[in-house]
Amino acid sequence: MCPGNWLWASMTFMARFSRSSSRSPVRTRGNLEEMPTVQHPFLNVFELERLLYTGKTACNHADEVWPGLYLGDQDMANNRRELRRLGITHVLNASHSRWRGTPEAYEGLGIRYLGVEAHDSPAFDMSIHFQTAADFIHRALSQPGGKILVHCAVGVSRSATLVLAYLMLYHHLTLVEAIKKVKDHRGIIPNRGFLRQLLALDRRLRQGLEA
């Protein structure tokens, strides 16, 4: 299971969702689990939150959510033995700071590192990092034997948002498809601001395909 922060995050999410639901009724257009692959025209952040809270909610310190792509927490990023055992070649830290994460931490392991200074706040613009992070993940998985750990503190919001953006940008999944794919393997809860930014990316990508 995830560290104790996961329980706190789940409780926070449920409280936030309950309050928002009481204020703003959610428009429903059928079961989200049965939503077609084409982006649903009425999809909104509240419906995404409902989807995120269905299905798998448990997680380990790291879970393989796509071939060679592990989504995890800070504990896994600090565990050199586990990184070596999994064959991790790249690390993307979505909670990089002066006190958390440096390339030097992986000296001797041959691991390439990218740090993204992101705050888990709805007001933070994570979208400015979507392409850079997706490119780094793509390069990691394109090399022979490449495996990447994408992590933040708990591995459910910042890092999950970047993984979803990668699946949308490089594998042309809709946001709903990307969420379902990740949730097959790990529970995630991107904050509401990140969900809005992913929705904007989804609309832009869908419009590009239709042009």
From Swiss-Prot:
Entry keyword Cytoplasm: yes
Subunit structure: Interacts with HSF4.
Pfam family, one: DSPc
GO cellular component: Golgi apparatus; nucleoplasm
Active site positions, chain numbering: 152
Localization in the cell: Cytoplasm; Nucleus; Golgi apparatus
Catalytic activity: O-phospho-L-tyrosyl-[protein] + H2O = L-tyrosyl-[protein] + phosphate; O-phospho-L-seryl-[protein] + H2O = L-seryl-[protein] + phosphate; O-phospho-L-threonyl-[protein] + H2O = L-threonyl-[protein] + phosphate
Keywords in alphabetical order: Cytoplasm, Golgi apparatus, Hydrolase, Nucleus, Protein phosphatase
Role this protein plays: Inactivates MAPK1 and MAPK3 which leads to dephosphorylation of heat shock factor protein 4 and a reduction in its DNA-binding activity.
GO molecular function annotations of the record: MAP kinase phosphatase activity; p53 binding; protein serine/threonine phosphatase activity; protein tyrosine phosphatase activity; protein tyrosine/serine/threonine phosphatase activity; RNA polymerase II-specific DNA-binding transcription factor binding
Classification via Gene3D superfamilies: Protein tyrosine phosphatase superfamily
InterPro entries given in the database record: Atypical_DUSP_subfamA (IPR020405), Dual-sp_phosphatase_cat-dom (IPR000340), Prot-tyrosine_phosphatase-like (IPR029021), Tyr_Pase_AS (IPR016130), Tyr_Pase_dom (IPR000387), TYR_PHOSPHATASE_DUAL_dom (IPR020422)
EC number: 3.1.3.16, 3.1.3.48
GO biological process: negative regulation of ERK1 and ERK2 cascade; negative regulation of transcription by RNA polymerase II; positive regulation of cell adhesion
Organism: Pongo abelii
Highest taxon in the source lineage: Eukaryota
Family of this protein: Belongs to the protein-tyrosine phosphatase family. Non-receptor class dual specificity subfamily.
Name of the molecule in the record: Dual specificity protein phosphatase 26
Domain Tyrosine-protein phosphatase positions: 60-207
